UniProtKB/Swiss-Prot annotation:
Reaction(s) this enzyme catalyzes, per UniProt: [GlcNAc-(1->4)-Mur2Ac(oyl-L-Ala-gamma-D-Glu-L-Lys-D-Ala-D-Ala)](n)-di-trans,octa-cis-undecaprenyl diphosphate + beta-D-GlcNAc-(1->4)-Mur2Ac(oyl-L-Ala-gamma-D-Glu-L-Lys-D-Ala-D-Ala)-di-trans,octa-cis-undecaprenyl diphosphate = [GlcNAc-(1->4)-Mur2Ac(oyl-L-Ala-gamma-D-Glu-L-Lys-D-Ala-D-Ala)](n+1)-di-trans,octa-cis-undecaprenyl diphosphate + di-trans,octa-cis-undecaprenyl diphosphate + H(+); Preferential cleavage: (Ac)2-L-Lys-D-Ala-|-D-Ala. Also transpeptidation of peptidyl-alanyl moieties that are N-acyl substituents of D-alanine
UniProt-annotated catalytic positions: E86, S461
Protein name per UniProt: Penicillin-binding protein 1A
Membrane side Cytoplasmic: residue ranges: 1-5
Protein species of origin: Pseudomonas aeruginosa (strain ATCC 15692 / DSM 22644 / CIP 104116 / JCM 14847 / LMG 12228 / 1C / PRS 101 / PAO1)
Length: 822
């Protein structure tokens, strides 16, 4: 009896001691516990996502893959699987499962250290949101106290929702929705019972039970959970049997971008980090860019096709490496280490036959490459020379060569190589500077250097329109005669002589400015710059957005020796396309928070709406040929009215600054249309459009090739060259390397679009001009042609020439900067 009494009081004492200890711990620790109320407004880390204007995913940035899911959207089968695996008493306890804690305590007494935590789902929520992974008594007590508070303040559904969105499930997947996408490539609601059980088994040990790394352990864990579900009555025998017999079919999935625009994605990422710092990667921001997915795809394909065409004109540089005599397994292992570059897949030649070659691709399949696709592969000697034409496949390849192939639309393979040259393309909406497409190189995987915004290159003759525009705003006209004749500059101090020349090494004598531009006569550009004066010209040109310190203070400026980026060129050319307004290229249209709230809406300077309406409504015809104007059907004013209405309902648009006379922009467009009609841009006539204007550009030794052009819908600039400047080849020019890319792209961009040119502004007249004098022609003058002028710049007739004056002289006597027009 005494013994029983002793045992009774001992138990009572122990229980009281535990209660007192727990109460003391609660009183001591509770003031420092975090507020459970914060869980109602918790902000989980969600990656940054970048989208096109039309909602296509471009890229995702962030360490954690997470897609939050609401409790109402969690499948009941998954809830049952999770409770069976982690906490089958979840519905009944108040945050702490005493039996589980007692079991954990017994293991501690037996082994001397903590083996299992005895944690409920609620306790895991407390740990995941508020505590560390440290294994200690104090942390466990904090966990218990927090769990009790959580159960008092949140519903069971809220607790489960917090849990399934926070847990780490391997392969950078946080939360069950992200895990379903990573392992099965579909949302959690579309998973089978077996697949849900597999994911429910991951929280315990994401690495050990990872189906990609440990399929055997993963299967055992899945089947154990299914058995628990059967015992607990969540599923019947039939569903259990079908689920355990289902094979593990998990594989690694990442959210595939719907649009390949990595250079755009990187531009958006950099801007977001500049705005929000490291939070850009975790706060679930959505960035909607100005890029149109169809135009971006066309731009990427145009650049790749153009570079491959150029590359094949200069011969085959040989295989990337040679692996003769190796086994098939060794070849396959090597291919597994190679990346696809710009859609060009690595392959190893396995056989060489008369009809072509057999190659092994990365999936281990052997496929044929026909001889027809290899005939271009003359040996590369230099950018100016090649070896003899190959006569058979054996002249090009041998077994063991690692080469590149390109999959064609019909499924066949084409023999190719990664181009050595690079390119950039940027296409803008001239009304506001929105970037509609941008390509910064052949392949982002090959090089993330964005040549569209980072490459400072000489633009060559594609810079001349800015010199000519300055001339038109300073007394010159499209009919002004300037002498295309040799000129020599001598630097007496440096004892140097500069003898600029035309590309053809020929000289045409006095010619009108219009002809000089479409024939790209260097001597005329230099003489025009002489007439303007360098400082006056530079002050004028900087209004287009060029940096003053990038513009040389000498007459080589007239030949395009400034250093500029394709982005700067495209932005500057927009001024001609929109009638004289300065717009700034931009790529982010809108930034949204994780819940869809608009945090930022672009409001760039825009061409005034009335100007857009006038341009669309006016049946302006083709200003490039004042003698025979052609009707060009506009898009109508509806689009412009919709733009205006949208702007009025969202924000007050910022009007763009006018930087050149509308008449100057109109006449420049006319002159640049002649570049395509009868000059260096004639290849663009293949598009069969009369509303296109543009200019080629080629620098010394053909180190850079350019083409910039536009209509009223898009301004597009293309550059081609080597990252380390070297010649593209003796017979390569802007018209052979850049213009074909521009034609491919604009052909798609303007497909099914009506002709769209700017309306003729008031204050322009058209006169018949004497080709010999550049003055108004008398009746019956042979070869007289029509030219357009500003009202105040109309030339007098030949009979009105004062004695001793030069025909066509553009500048008044009081502006007599040193000039040698003749």
């Amino acid at each position: 009896m005494r013994l029983l009494k002793f045992l009774w009081w001992t138990c009572v004492t122990l229980i009281c001691g535990v209660l007192l200890s727990f109460s003391g711990a609660y009183l001591y620790l509770s003031p420092s516990l975090p507020s459970v109320e914060a869980l109602r407004n918790v902000q989980l880390q969600i990656p940054l996502k970048v989208y096109s204007e039309d909602g296509k995913l471009i890229s995702e940035f962030g360490e954690m893959r997470r897609t939050p899911i609401r409790f109402a959207d969690i499948p009941q089968d998954f809830i049952h699987a999770l409770l069976s695996a982690e906490d089958d008493n979840f519905a009944n306890h108040y945050g702490v499962d005493v039996k589980s804690l007692m079991r954990a305590a017994a293991q501690l007494l037996k082994s001397g250290h903590i083996q299992t935590g005895g944690s409920t789902i609620t306790m895991q929520v407390a740990k995941n949101y508020f505590l560390t992974n440290e294994r200690s008594f104090s942390r466990k007590i904090n966990e218990i106290l927090l769990a009790l508070q959580i159960e008092r303040q949140l519903t069971k559904d809220e607790i489960l929702e917090l849990y399934v969105n926070k847990i780490y499930l391997g392969n950078r997947a946080y939360g069950i929705e992200a895990a379903a996408q990573v392992y099965y490539g579909k949302p959690i609601k579309d998973l089978s019972l077996a697949e849900m059980a597999m994911i429910a088994g991951l929280p315990k040990a994401p690495s050990r039970y990872n189906p990609l790394v440990n399929p055997t352990r993963s299967t055992e864990r899945r089947n154990w959970i299914l058995e628990r579900m059967l015992k607990l009555g969540f599923i019947d025998q039939q569903r259990y049997q079908a689920a355990v017999e289902e094979p593990i079919n998990a594989s690694y999935h990442v959210q595939t971008p719907e649009l390949n625009a990595p250079y755009i994605a990187e531009m958006a990422r950099a801007e977001m980090v500049g705005r929000y710092g490291s939070e850009a990667y975790t706060e679930g921001y959505k960035v909607i860019t100005t890029v149109r997915s169809d135009l971006q795809n066309a731009a990427s394909q145009s650049v790749r096709d153009g570079l491959i065409d150029y590359d094949q004109r200069h011969g085959y540089r040989g295989p990337e490496t040679r692996l003769p005599g190796q086994t098939r397994d060794a070849w396959l292992k090597h291919l597994g280490q190679q990346r696809s570059i710009g859609g060009l897949e690595p392959a190893i030649v396995t056989q060489v036959e008369k009809s072509g070659i057999m190659v092994m691709t990365r999936d281990g399949k052997e496929e044929a490459v026909t001889w027809d696709s290899m005939k271009w592969a003359r040996p590369f000697l230099s950018n100016n020379s090649m070896g003899p034409m190959p006569r058979q496949p054996a002249d090009v390849a041998q077994a063991g060569d690692q080469i590149r192939v390109q999959r064609q639309e019909d499924g066949t393979l084409r023999f190719v190589q990664i181009p050595a040259a690079q390119s950039a393309l940027i296409s803008l909406d001239p009304k506001d500077g929105a970037i509609r497409s941008l390509v910064g190189g052949f392949s982002f995987e090959q090089s993330n250097y964005n040549r569209a915004i980072q490459a400072k290159r000489q633009p060559g003759s594609s810079f001349k329109p800015f010199i000519y525009s300055a001339a038109l705003d300073n007394g010159f006209t499209a009919a002004s005669l300037v002498n295309d004749a040799p000129i020599v500059f001598v630097d007496e101090y440096l004892d140097k002589v500069w003898r600029p020349k035309n590309d053809t090494n020929t000289f045409l004598g006095p010619i009108p400015l219009r002809e000089a531009l479409y024939k790209s006569r260097n001597m005329v550009s230099i003489r025009v710059l002489q007439g303007l004066g360098i400082e006056r010209a530079i002050s004028y040109i900087t209004k287009f957005g060029f940096q003053r310190d990038e513009l040389p203070r000498n007459f080589s400026l007239a030949l395009g020796t400034a250093t500029v980026t394709p982005m700067e060129i495209a932005g500057a050319w927009s001024v001609f396309a929109n009638g004289g307004y300065k717009v700034n290229p931009y790529v982010i249209e809108r930034i949204e928070s994780r819940d869809g709230q608009v945090l930022y809406q672009a409001n760039p300077p825009r061409v005034p709406v009335e100007e857009q309406v006038a341009a669309d409504a006016e049946d302006a015809g083709n200003p490039g040929d004042p003698e025979h104007p052609e009707s060009a059907e506009g898009e109508g004013s509806i689009e412009a009215q919709q733009v205006a209405a949208k702007a009025q309902t969202t924000f007050e648009p910022t009007p763009a600054e006018r930087i050149i006379d509308a008449r100057t922009a109109y006449i420049m467009t006319s002159m640049l249309q002649d570049v395509i009609k009868r000059g260096t841009g004639r290849r663009a006539l293949a598009l069969k459009r009369t509303d296109l204007a543009g200019k080629t550009g080629t620098t010394n030794d053909s180190k850079d090739g350019w083409f910039s052009g536009y209509n009223s819908d898009y301004v597009t600039s293309v550059w081609v060259g080597f990252d380390q400047p070297e010649t593209l080849g003796r017979r390569e020019y802007g018209g052979t390397v850049a213009l074909p890319i521009w034609i491919r792209y604009m052909g798609f961009a303007l497909k099914d679009k009506p002709m769209h040119t700017m309306a003729e502004p008031p204050g322009i007249v058209s006169l018949r001009i004497d080709p010999v004098t550049g003055r108004s022609a008398a009746p019956g003058t042979p070869g007289a042609y029509f030219e357009m002028f500003k009202n105040e710049d109309t030339p007098p007739s030949v009979n009105e020439l004062p004695p001793g004056s030069f025909p066509g002289s553009p500048l008044p006597d009081d502006e007599g900067a040193p000039i040698d027009l003749f």
